[in-house]
Amino acid sequence: MSGGSEVVRLNESKRELFENAASLDGIFSPKSVALVHTGLPEAPGADAISTFLNGGFQGTSFVIQPGSSPAPGTRTYARLSDVPCKVDLAVAVTSAEAAPAVVADFVQHNVKGVVLLSPRLGTHDAYSPEAAAQMRSILGSSRTRVIGPGALGVMSPLLGLNATAGLPMAMGGTVAFVCESPLLGRVVLDWSLKHLVGFSSFACVGSMLDVSWANLIDYFGQDPNTRTIALQISSAGNARSLISAAREVSLNKPIIVIKAGLDGHAARAFTWKSRCQSSDSQVLTAALERVGVIEVDGINDLFYTADALSKQPRPRGPRLMLVSNADGPGVLAADSLARAGVELASPSEETRSQVQQLLREENTLDDVLGDGSAENYVAVAKLAVNDPNCDGVLLLLVPWALADPELTAAMLLELRNSSKPILISYLGAADTGSAQEALIRACIPTFSSPEVAGRVFQSMWRYSYELQALYETPVLHAEGDFQTHDFVYQLIVQARSSGRSSLSPEESAEVLARYGIATCGPNVAAVPDRNGVLAKLGLRVDPQFGAVLMFGSVDRGPGVYGDVAIGLPPLNAILARRMLEKSAFYRGLLREYQTGSLRALEEFLVRFSHIASDQPLIEEFEVEGLISPSDVLAISSRCKLHAPHTKSEDLPRPAIRPYPVQYVSPWRMKNGQTVTMRPIRAEDEPLMVKFHEALSDHSVYMRYFQRVKLSTRTAHQRLSRVCFLDYDREFALLAEVRDPHSDDRRIVAVATLVKSPQKSEGEVAVLISDDCQRQGLGKELVRRLIGFARDEGLSRVVASTMFDNFGMSVVFERLGFQLSTDFEEQLVNATLSLDS
C-alpha cells in the first residue's frame, strides 16, 4: 500500500472503559450534592441531612425540602429546579412506591448520581417488578446512575462525603468496601471505627437496580485512592459482567469477598441433583476464585488480609516460617498453624548452622531464646527471611523480663523492604502498644494471635496462586476437532427434534467417546475387573453462571454426594488440577496414588469441560468413573438436554468465555506467504516482545504519535494486559508466520477491537510489521474484525488514522467506512454502521 506506515492508532488506554468507570464519579466523587427530604413519616431524612452537614463535605451542598423552613446553616430550596447550579449527586429518602417519580425528577434535571436511601433502616425496601421496570425505563439511555433503592448510603471519607442514613463518618483509608446488606454495613462500620480501619469509599447499595457489581469493581479498579476492594456479595446479578470486571481488576488490585451463604454442613446436605438448580455460594465462590478473587470467613480476616496485601509483597509459595522468642508459645503456635492447614517451612541446613553459631546453644527457630536480646532475635529473623525454604515469615514475640519490645520493633524495621511478606504476632502484649504502632507505621502488619496471622498468610498465598491461573487460556479444540462438535451437535438436535429431552445410554456413551473419554459403553456389566476408586463427575447449568462442573466421591447414601469440588469450564490441565485440589476426596487420592498417575483424571476433566463449553444444549450430564492408578474409565453416564422448545438465545451464557477458536484460519499474503490468523493468547507475550523489537522508529511514531521507548512498549505489565484479554471487552487478532526450517513462529501483525462499555460500538486498530506492510494484511485484519463485531451484535465500528496514512484510509473506504477529517487532531476518522 502506498504512503506511510500501515498503522492505526490502538486505544491502549481503553478510553471507553475509563469513561464507563468515571460515570460513577457523580456518586463517589461529586462536586455538588442535593439532599432531598421527601417528608416520609418516620423516615431518617433529618438524620441524613444532619449527618451530611457534619461530615465536612468539600463541595457545594443543598437541601431540597418542600413546604418547610430552611434547615439551619443550609441552602434550602423547595424544588430541585430551583437549585442555581448543576447537581452531581442527589440523596433521597424514599419508599419503593415513590421511587419512580423521584428518579424521573432527577433524570429530568440531568443529575449524574442518585442514592435512594431506605425509609426503614437496616432493611431492604421491597418493591414490585412493575416499579423496578418503570425505573429502568425512566433511566433508559440517560447518564444518571442510581444506588438503591433501599440503600444505607455511600461515603467517601477522603472528600468528607457522608451520604448515609445517619451513620457516623468512616475513617479515611485505602480500602473500598461495598455490601448489599444494610445490617452488615452497620456492623462493618462499627468494627472499622473500633479497630481504626479506614476506607477510600464505603457503600451499602441495597437493591442493585442500576449500578452493578461490574460497574463498582471497574470504578474502584481505576480509583487511585483504592488499593484493595472488599465486597459482600449476596447475589451476583449479571454473572458474566461481574466475572469480566473482577478478572480485569484483580490483576492489579486484590478483591476480597466475605464468605456468605451455605456453610459446610449445609452444602454437604445438598443432593447432587439439586446442587446447581440455583446459584448457591459454592458456585459463586468457584467463579470468583477462577478470576483471582479471595474469599475469607469474617470481617477480621477481610480487613487484616486487605491491610497485609496493601503493605506487604505477595508470597511466591505457601511455606511460612515461624520464628519465636519463647519455647512454649512457639510450639503451641506451630501446632495450631499446622492444624489450620498452614504449610510450615523447615529451615535449610545452612540456616540451622548459622542459628547455632549465632546463639551458641541448642535453639531452634521456634525458640530463639539466646540471651533474650533484640539483636539476636532480629539477626535470626533476617536468616529466616533469606532462607530459600520459606515464602513468608511469621515473627512471634512474647514480652518477657529480659526483652525490650520497643528496641526489638525498631530493629525489625530493617526488614520492611523484604521481598517476602513479614507478619508479626505479639502475645500477651498489654505493654507493647508503641512497639506495634511503630511496626504498623512501617507497613509491617501485627496480629493478636499467630492463628489470625496464619490465615492472612494463606489468603495472601491464595491470591498469588489464583493470579497464576488467570493467565491460563484454555483452548476448546485442537485443529480438526470441529468434526467432533458437529457430530455431537447433530446427535443432540436430532434427539430434541424427535421430542426427547435426554440422550439414550448408548448416545451418552457415544458423546463421551467422541470427546476422547474412555468408556465401557452403555453396558455396566462390561466394566473390566480392575482395582480402582469410584468418582462422580457432573455438569449442571446454573441460571446465572451457565455450565458448572462438579467432581466428588460416590456416596452410597440416599442420593447425597459430599465433598464436591466445583469449577467453571473451559479447563486445561492446570485449571483442572486447581479444581480437583479443592476436594478432600482428590487429596486422598493423591496420598494413595502417585501424582503422575492422576494426570489421566485431569485429562478426563479437561475433555469433559470441552463438552460443557461446546454443547450448550446439554442441561445435565452425570458420569460415574472408575479411577485407577493408570487411567479413568467412564462406566455409566446420563445426559439430559434442554427442553425441545427452549430457544438457544434463552439459554444461560457461560461465565467464562473460551478461547474463540472459530476465528483461527490460514490466509495468503500478496507475496504468496501463508500466515495464520488467530486470536491472541496470554502465552504470546514473548512473541509480542520480538514483534515490537522489529518495528522501525517510523512505525512506532505513526502508531503512538510520539516516540516511545522499546522498554516501555515491551514492559511485562503492559504486554501481559495486551495478551491477556477478556473477549467480552476486547478482541485482538494476530497474524503469525512459521519458519519452514526451524518451525519458529513470528508475529507480523496485530489488530484489536475495543468494545464500548455499552457493547454497542467497537474501535478498531491495526499494527503491522515493516517487512509485511503493503501485503493486504491491513484490509484482511479489519475485514475479520468487522465479522467479529457483527457476531458480537455491535451496531458500528470506528477507527482513526493519521492524515498521511493514505493506505489505511483507502482500506477503510473500500470496506464501506464513512470517512471524516479532524483537522485539529490531524486525523481521518472512519465509521462503519453494522445495523443495515
PLM region descriptions:
Residues 354, 545, 557-559, 642-644, ...:
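A short local loop/turn or secondary-structure capping micro-motif enriched for an aromatic residue
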Residues 204, 637-638, 679, 752:
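Short clusters of small/polar residues that mark proteolytic maturation junctions
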Residues 537, 623-625, 637-639, 764, ...:
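A structural signal for short, well-ordered beta-strand segments
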Residues 643-836:
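Long, contiguous binding/interaction regions
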Residues 2-636:
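Catalytic-core regions of core metabolic enzymes
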